[in-house]
């Protein structure tokens, strides 16, 4: 019997999840950045800048942006590594990748963009100085496999950054639930004409591992000195780990 996994609150066959997630992101790609600004009141930009500040990048370094979508982090990383460095933008979803590529082309930038699965990265071992995945890990079917792949492609001494929605501070749970399950789908319907995708967003956040659980998963994948930093009362957490 085929194994099952969660797609939001639904239980689906593992073989079906990727296609269902793809449908969500094909649907929201064109309005993705606008919705991020609306949903977070612009805070997502601060979260991402904090993540980049924790990357420890220098000119000439190689960075892999997994599930990089519309290239917010890629564009920030490019400023850090300079002309002598490399930033690879990847995403499994072509619609999202196209949005990111087009944004960079409009800015006169031409970094490489690769459509690939974060659970099966087509890159050599011990290659990148830094790997990031922002708001992408929770959509992956086999998170442990994805973390192992990110560990594989990092060079010894390199670091992984996982920026993801997490478990909010308990006194705020009721208000956060109201916002997530009532306002998010409403905004999705009004702005993107797609309430269902934002209902999935709220559900996928609740099903994603919390701070300590994700820390343990990273350690199981081989990362050392794993730590995390909560932002906005735990709405988002940045996990950081190193390959030794």
Curated annotation (Swiss-Prot):
Family: Belongs to the class I-like SAM-binding methyltransferase superfamily. MenG/UbiE family.
Xref: PANTHER family: 2-METHOXY-6-POLYPRENYL-1,4-BENZOQUINOL METHYLASE, MITOCHONDRIAL, METHYLTRANSFERASE
Keyword list, A-Z: Menaquinone biosynthesis, Methyltransferase, S-adenosyl-L-methionine, Transferase, Ubiquinone biosynthesis
A Gene Ontology BP annotation from the UniProt entry: methylation
Gene3D superfamilies registered for this protein in UniProt: Vaccinia Virus protein VP39 (3.40.50.150)
Keyword S-adenosyl-L-methionine: yes
InterPro entries, A to Z: SAM-dependent_MTases_sf, UbiE/COQ5_MeTrFase, UbiE/COQ5_MeTrFase_CS
Catalytic class of the enzyme: transferase
Residues the entry annotates as binding S-adenosyl-L-methionine: 70, 91, 117-118
SUPFAM superfamilies per record: S-adenosyl-L-methionine-dependent methyltransferases
Annotated EC: 2.1.1.163, 2.1.1.201
Pathway: Quinol/quinone metabolism; menaquinone biosynthesis; menaquinol from 1,4-dihydroxy-2-naphthoate: step 2/2; Cofactor biosynthesis; ubiquinone biosynthesis
The keyword S-adenosyl-L-methionine is assigned to this record: yes
Purpose: Methyltransferase required for the conversion of demethylmenaquinol (DMKH2) to menaquinol (MKH2) and the conversion of 2-polyprenyl-6-methoxy-1,4-benzoquinol (DDMQH2) to 2-polyprenyl-3-methyl-6-methoxy-1,4-benzoquinol (DMQH2).
NCBIfam families: MenG_MenH_UbiE, PRK00216.1-1
Record's catalysed reaction(s): a 2-demethylmenaquinol + S-adenosyl-L-methionine = a menaquinol + S-adenosyl-L-homocysteine + H(+); a 2-methoxy-6-(all-trans-polyprenyl)benzene-1,4-diol + S-adenosyl-L-methionine = a 5-methoxy-2-methyl-3-(all-trans-polyprenyl)benzene-1,4-diol + S-adenosyl-L-homocysteine + H(+)
Organism expressing this protein natively: Thiobacillus denitrificans (strain ATCC 25259 / T1)
Identification of the protein by name: Ubiquinone/menaquinone biosynthesis C-methyltransferase UbiE
Domain of life, per lineage: Bacteria
PROSITE patterns on file: SAM_MT_UBIE (PS51608), UBIE_1 (PS01183), UBIE_2 (PS01184)
A single GO molecular function term of this UniProt record: 2-methoxy-6-polyprenyl-1,4-benzoquinol methyltransferase activity
């Amino acid at each position: 019997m085929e194994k099952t996994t969660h797609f939001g609150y639904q239980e689906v066959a593992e073989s079906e999840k990727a296609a269902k997630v793809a449908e969500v992101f094909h649907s929201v790609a064109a309005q993705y950045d606008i919705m991020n600004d609306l949903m977070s009141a612009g805070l997502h930009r601060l979260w991402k800048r904090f993540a980049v500040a924790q990357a420890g990048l220098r000119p000439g370094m190689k960075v892999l942006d997994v599930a990089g979508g519309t290239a917010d982090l890629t564009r920030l990383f490019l400023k850090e590594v300079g002309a002598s460095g490399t930033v690879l933008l990847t995403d499994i979803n072509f619609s999202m990748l196209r949005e990111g590529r087009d944004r960079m082309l409009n800015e006169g930038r031409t970094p490489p963009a690769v459509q690939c699965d974060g659970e099966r990265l087509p890159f050599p071992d011990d290659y990148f100085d830094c790997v990031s995945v922002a708001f992408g890990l929770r959509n992956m079917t086999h998170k442990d496999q994805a973390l192992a792949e990110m560990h594989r492609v990092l060079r010894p001494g390199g670091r992984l950054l996982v920026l993801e929605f997490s478990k909010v501070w308990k006194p705020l749970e009721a208000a956060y639930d109201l916002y997530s399950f009532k306002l998010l789908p409403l905004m999705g319907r009004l702005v993107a004409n797609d309430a269902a995708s934002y209902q999935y967003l709220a559900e996928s956040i609740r099903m994603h591992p919390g701070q300590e659980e994700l820390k343990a998963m990273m350690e199981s994948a081989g990362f050392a000195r794993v730590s995390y930093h909560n932002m906005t009362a735990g709405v988002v957490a940045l996990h950081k780990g190193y390959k030794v």
